[in-house]
Amino acid sequence: MEDLDFPICILKMNLQCCEDFPSRVKKLLRQVKGVYAITIDPVKGLILVCGTAEPSVLIKAVAKLGQSPQLYAYEKDPATAKTRFRTLLKRYATNKTQDKPSPPAPPVTATTPVETCPAGGETFRGFGYPGPTTMMQMPAFSLPPPRGLPGWLAPPTNPRLKYEEPKVTPRKPPAPYPFDYYENLGFPPSDSLFNYFSDDNPQPCSIM
C-alpha cells in the first residue's frame, strides 16, 4: 500500500464478531470502483483502503453487511497519506509489544449471550435467536386471543321468526245443477213434415 500514490481512507468497526467477517468485508470492498489496495486489522478493528473512492461510498458498501463503520481518518493528498500511514504502522507495532495477553474467553453456556455476526458465520444462531442491535429483529408471532363461536355457529341476537304454514282454502262444492244440464241439447227440431210423424217428437200428429 505504501507504493501506491492514492488517497488513503481508514475505517473503524468491530471485525471480531465471526472468523470470516474480515474476508467478507474485503471481498465487498473489492467490488467498489476506485479501490486499489485493502489492508484489514481485525484485532484493532481498522480497515485501510487505498484508492480514489470516496469515504461515503466505502461506508455505504460496508454497511450492507449489517454494521455501519466509522470514518477514522482520511487523507486525500498521496504524499501526506504515505507519511501518516507509516506513522500509524509504527504506532501499532509499538502498541502490540506492550499489549498483554488477554484472558481466555469464558465458556458459552445456555445463559451466556452469544455475540452474533450480522453477516452470518459460525456463531450465527439463525431464525428465532437474538441478533445484534444493528440487525433487524424479526417480529414476535403469537396466537390470536381466543374468541367465541364463529358467526355461523353463534346464537343470533334477534329471535328467529316462527314459520307458519300457508292457509289452504278448500274448494267449494259445485252448485246443484239438474242432471242433464251439461248435456248437448242439439239443434231445435226443424219444422218439416217428417218431424210431425217422428217418434222423437213429443207432440206428433197421428193419422186417425
UniProtKB/Swiss-Prot annotation:
The modification Cysteine methyl ester is found at residue 205. The keyword Zinc-finger does not apply. GO terms for molecular function: metal ion binding. Residues 93-116 are annotated as: Disordered. CDD domains: HMA. Keywords: Lipoprotein, Metal-binding, Methylation, Prenylation. Residues 206-208 form a propeptide. Signal peptide: none annotated. Belongs to the HIPP family. This is Heavy metal-associated isoprenylated plant protein 42. It comes from Arabidopsis thaliana.
